[in-house]
Amino acid sequence: MGGRHSDRFAGRTVLVTGGGAGIGAATAHRLADEGAAVVILDNEEEGGHRTARQITASGARAAFVLGDVTDEPAWTRAVRTAHDGFGSLDGLVSNAGLMRPGPADALSLSDWEGQLGVNLTGAFLGVRACLEDLRARRGAIVLTSSVHALIGLPARPAYAATKAGLTGLGRQLAVDYGPVVRVNCVLPGPILTRAWEEVAEEDLRLTIEQTVAGRHGHPDEVAAAIAFLLSDDASYVTGTSLVVDGGWSVYKTSV
């Protein structure tokens, strides 16, 4: 946000889901700062429009598509917007996510299915909608998973299952569509997004104490990792998961 990092995405278009806030918004800004045209797909109209307006005000290119990642026609509209507005589609960042905590015996079926739909089925639908273009352009995909795919935390069965599923999906897609399309996952840890605004101050303090870096991460830091995985700098990186958690999962598994 605010200042060109490089031009390594010049002439490319990237579709980012959940780009209205948090990691998605930071990623959209980062890619635009590096020369990409960005299509934002989000079901929150205000946030999606805000990100697109901020990018275009900076002199970069962006478009917003209102829609839910679980809705196939929304994906069709987003891909069409990339074609009509920017002439190509070169990358996909499947970032939209949903977490509704609760242990398995207290989690409703609708909450389970809701998280499965957004976190996993939404990514599948996006990949399917974008693959023809990405194969033609030798593009790249980044799926936003979570350290919850690696470690267990209380009352997160649906979220953990879907995020672990994303890492498996990423590996499989890399095998099925390489060497033409690269597919990787990014696994954020304790990142200061909107979800953390409701966390008690004591819990925030404990999280910092249990993080090797000694602090929470910021959406811009995850966006930098996503930009790397999408870029030609990662041309020999596919089928892997990049953990961006300040060493939190290392600490949790070493004590």
Regions found by a protein language model. Give the residues of each.
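Active-site helix of classical SDR
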Residues: V127, T162, G170
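Residue(s) in the substrate-gating loop at a strand-loop-helix junction
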Residues: S146
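Short C-terminal tail/terminal secondary-structure segment
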Residues: G2-H5, I151, A227, T238-V255
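Alpha-helical segment proximal to the catalytic Tyr-Lys
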Residues: E132, A174-P179, S235
